[in-house]
Amino acid sequence: MIDKKISPATVCLLMTLWMILAIIIGFVIKSVVLVAVFLLPVVVYEIYRTKGEFTSLSSWLMLAVLIGELIFIIFGINYNLAEYFGSQDAYIAGQYVPLGDIKILGPTLMAVFSLVLLVRTYGPYTKWLSVIIFVSSLIIIYILNPNAFQDLLKMVIHNNSFNY
């Protein structure tokens, strides 16, 4: 549909510029909601682009997590998953994911799902979109809680989590 009117490269370039704008404004005004809302069309286009069984599932899960993340942030829902599960991390989709405030888990899961797409998709545009989503997810974590961002990086380095 959209690819017949506008080339995927043009759409991905526009999505990249769109998210750069969102990240800059989000940093300046410290708004996670702004970055997350701007990320919605990127994730929706990723869903449109993915065709495989697991990649489509990963794309749809990202959308569900992003919508959940927006609900948690807008309504100020705080829940400490580490206390609930009695563990500081969980092994999800082949990656160790830190547990803590549920609002940090959402973008962390999105980063993991985007890495799954980066590795499992064949198309250059779905890979491009997955990188946009990955970077945006990390930015969301950083704006939410810079300390949680540092902890996530330490965990990744310590566990070598993203070694495919």
Predicted regions and their residues:
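Short, aromatic-rich membrane-interface segments at the entry and exit
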Residues: F27-F38, T55-S58, Y125-V131
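C-terminal TM-helix exit segments that contain a strictly Trp-centered aromatic cap at the helix terminus
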Residues: I67-A82, I140-L152
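Transmembrane alpha-helical segments of multi-pass membrane proteins
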Residues: S58-I73, S130-I141
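Canonical alpha-helical transmembrane segments
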Residues: F38-M62, F113-L115
